[in-house]
């Protein structure tokens, strides 16, 4: 998802990309892509909610800025989006997380564990009702 340039950040972009995907699916196949939006500090909760309501958007995806390929548009400070995350929780919209701390002083093999401790644990405590999927996690912590 962050490998798309530019990232899919609005419902309209997701709808367009959905159509592009279906254009290349052979007619004899039954395939329904589940579209997600790339979460930024400027994401519009009304657009997200409308996308979910219309069946276009299934979830939003959080990439910490600088955590992976093409994630520079990601969230720099999760505290800046807490209000949006609270609204996602109230609307029961899942948050998919690429859980990785981005501080260059943290060993690459410790970045998931540090993210869990410093970011995910406080988030879960602050917004316990928020549905979270921590994607491709490899740490035991």
Enumerate the predicted regions with their spans:
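Metal-cofactor-binding active-site regions of metalloenzymes
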Residues: 1-47, 55-72
């Amino acid at each position: 998802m962050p490998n798309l340039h530019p990232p899919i950040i609005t419902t309209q972009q997701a709808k367009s990309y959905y159509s592009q995907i279906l254009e290349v699916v052979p007619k004899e196949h039954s395939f329904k892509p589940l579209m997600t939006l790339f979460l930024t500090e400027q994401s519009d909760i009304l657009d997200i909610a409308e996308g979910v309501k219309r069946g276009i958007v299934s979830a939003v995806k959080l990439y910490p800025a600088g955590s992976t390929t093409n994630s520079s548009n990601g969230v720099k400070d999760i505290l800046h989006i807490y209000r949006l995350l609270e609204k996602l929780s109230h609307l029961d919209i899942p948050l998919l997380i690429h859980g990785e701390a981005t501080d260059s002083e943290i060993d690459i093999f410790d970045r998931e564990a540090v993210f869990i401790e410093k970011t995910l644990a406080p988030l879960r405590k602050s917004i316990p009702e928020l549905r979270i999927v921590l994607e491709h996690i490899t740490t035991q912590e």
